[in-house]
């Protein structure tokens, strides 16, 4: 049942289920517990396989948005045009093969949390569109003219060195 699934998900993301006793991990968990209670956008940086998605899930499932959707997108797994369609959705006929309207991940996460994994792989154009959603809480589906409003908390993760990417113009400083 859906209720049993929700209980299971909450149990997975309980802070005491994140295993580790190092001082560094305890510092991270202290920060994560504080961040979970806020509504702020979060950036998680760490090497591949270090549990960034687990931390993102713990933040969501211990937040005021925990009763709403936790939607995950791996930005590195999709080409730019597919990523934009995945994030923002598209209208019927927006591009070849768009035979019906599709709701994007931002709409699916409305009221909840959107987790963007490997955000450092995102193009500057898509970064600008993400920034608009963060600042204005609105966007249009691909091929659409109607502005849609959403209330989404964004948690992003990367294994990249974003400060050096900002310096080289590969990543937006304001994002």
What are these regions (language model features)?
Residues 1-11:
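Residue-level detector of conserved catalytic or cofactor/ligand-binding positions
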Residues 9-149, 154-160, 165:
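AAA+ ATPase active-site-proximal loops
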Residues 170:
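Basic, amphipathic DNA-recognition helix from helix-turn-helix-like DNA-binding domains
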């Amino acid at each position: 049942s859906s209720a049993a699934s929700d209980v299971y998900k909450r149990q997975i993301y309980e802070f005491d289920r994140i295993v580790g006793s190092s001082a560094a991990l305890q510092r991270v968990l202290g920060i994560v517990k504080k961040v979970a209670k806020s509504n702020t956008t979060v950036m998680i940086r760490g090497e591949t396989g270090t549990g960034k998605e687990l931390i993102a899930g713990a933040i969501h499932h211990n937040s005021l948005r925990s009763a709403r959707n936790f939607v995950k997108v791996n930005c590195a797994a999709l080409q730019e045009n597919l990523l934009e369609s995945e994030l923002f959705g598209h209208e019927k006929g927006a591009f070849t093969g768009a035979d019906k309207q599709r709701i994007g991940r931002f709409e699916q996460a409305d009221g909840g949390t959107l987790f963007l994994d490997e955000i450092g792989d995102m193009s500057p154009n898509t970064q600008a569109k993400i920034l608009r959603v963060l600042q204005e809480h609105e966007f249009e589906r691909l091929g659409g003219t109607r502005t849609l409003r959403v209330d989404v908390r964004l948690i992003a993760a990367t294994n990249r060195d974003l400060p050096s990417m900002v310096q080289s113009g590969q990543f937006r400083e304001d994002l």
